[in-house]
Regions:
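Viral structural modules
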Residues: 1-269
Length: 269
């Protein structure tokens, strides 16, 4: 595959709504919350949709939805701390160049002494690939109903069945009634458009995209997003370092050229 365009993203996702399980929602609705401690954020799934941009030939919009499992520790005025979990969702759109090829591809599967199986027709339209590392939990807070955001941007009306199964069958509360939990996450990702193409070319070391498609700003003093802005992009997480004995022209991060999504819960059952 040939990569036609790519970009990297280092984003601070501020105040993302967490849709809690029913038991967790009842806990925070009871009030008396003393503190909220962020514990863990796990990326469950990424949903990708690629569409051609009509007014700009060769360019495509890539709409991405990230699904996270969020775990926090809530301390109440009375009683011991409780662990709660829920679902957070973040939507992102980027525009990348993918070329104008539109060839139709027909292929078959070989059958000895029989008629070959005709495979489903395909095309060489670009494919979007999103590489992400698990996000970093930067902040968490519970907001009272009278001050929470009840706009449409916070509304989630439907959750894929495969995502719901990651919460042990517990129902997720999608309504905007009652107290709400918000978290701030730091996320690194690489997004690219690629096509199947017949080329013979030499292979070099890792190539980190030059373009930055982050769309989050930097907060104020002691802001979690400001802290996250000081983090280095984790190149080795996307491109595992090679052995020094490989004899390559470029090695490690010093040689960096700045130039099927499976929805599961991390088990192989």
């Amino acid at each position: 595959k040939k990569v036609y365009d790519s970009c990297r993203s280092k984003e601070c996702l501020r105040d993302i709504r967490v849709y809690l399980t029913r038991d967790a929602q009842e806990l925070i609705n009871a009030g008396g919350i003393a503190s909220v401690k962020p514990r863990e954020a796990e990326l469950l799934c990424v949903s990708i949709d690629v569409e051609r941009i009509q007014f700009n030939r060769g360019f495509y919009s890539v709409d991405i939805r990230f699904f996270y499992r969020i775990e926090c520790e809530i301390s109440c005025v009375i009683g011991r701390p409780r662990i709660v979990d829920g679902l957070a969702v973040f939507d992102k759109r980027v525009v990348l160049f993918g070329g104008e090829g539109g060839a139709r591809i027909f292929s078959s599967q070989y059958i000895e002494d029989g008629r070959d199986v005709q495979l489903r027709p395909d095309s060489n339209k670009p494919t979007a690939v999103v590489e992400v590392v698990d996000p970093i939990m930067l902040d968490a807070r519970v907001v009272a109903p009278e001050t929470s955001c009840n706009c449409c941007c916070c509304a989630l009306h439907e959750v894929p069945r495969s995502i719901c199964s990651c919460f042990g069958g517990d129902d997720l509360v999608l309504s905007n009634d009652g107290y709400q939990l918000f978290v701030t996450l730091g996320q690194f990702s690489i997004i690219r458009l690629e096509r199947d193409i017949q080329l013979l070319m030499p292979a070099y070391d890792v190539c980190l995209p030059r373009r930055d498609c982050s769309n989050s700003g930097v907060g104020g003093e002691q802001d979690p997003c400001e802290i996250f802005s000081s983090f280095d992009f984790p190149i080795d997480a996307f491109f595992p370092p090679q052995s020094d004995k490989a004899g390559c022209l470029f090695t490690g991060s010093a040689g960096v050229n700045d130039n099927r999504s499976g929805c599961s819960c991390g088990n192989n059952n």
